[in-house]
Amino acid sequence: MKIFDFIIVGGGTSGTVKAEKLIKNGHTVLIIEEGKKNSNPFLSMPAGWIPMLEGSPYLKFYKSSPQPQLGNRQHDIAQAKVFGGGSSVNGMVYMRGKPSDYENWVRETGDERWGWDSLVQNYKQLENNQRLGGEFHGNEGPIKVS
């Protein structure tokens, strides 16, 4: 039986980036992913995933808890079931919240590390954005975005 230093549950962007860092530091890593291999060409096309929503082998749908602010309605929540995670089924969209979103987190938690000035540095380390440089985007990280 093979023994691993770390087991990561979820083969999405976060899991695979973390695995890469651990491997570069000499650790052995096992990634466990519920879904299929990311080999469908529609997953690599902007909006190509839309036809696959109905009965997709790459998505699992859950119901939210009843939402009092919405008349106790429940909503479908799609969860990726594919190696690559939500990044494989999100229409190739990448975005961050606006700075005030993160400042709300600071107000809620009292922890400045959740603020924009702190988190934008993390985003920059993760991004490999060759189109938009500047002070708010990174261009040497493991996640290719544009």
Question: Where do the language-model regions lie?
Answer:
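A short, basic/flexible loop-to-alpha-helix module at the beginning of a structural domain
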Residues: 1-3
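Residue-level detector of alpha-helical segments with a strong bias toward transmembrane helices
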Residues: 15, 25, 43, 94-95
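Active-site-proximal beta-strand/loop segments in catalytic clefts of secreted hydrolases
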Residues: 11, 32-35, 80, 92
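Active-site-proximal flexible loops/turns
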Residues: 22, 40, 92
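Gly/Ser/Thr-rich beta-alpha loop segments that engage phosphate groups in nucleotides
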Residues: 12-17, 37, 82, 86-88
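Rossmann-like flavin
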Residues: 76-146
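N-terminal Rossmann-like FAD-binding beta1-loop-alpha1 element of flavoenzymes
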Residues: 5-31
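N-terminal FAD cofactor-binding segment of flavoenzymes
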Residues: 25-27, 34-83, 112-122
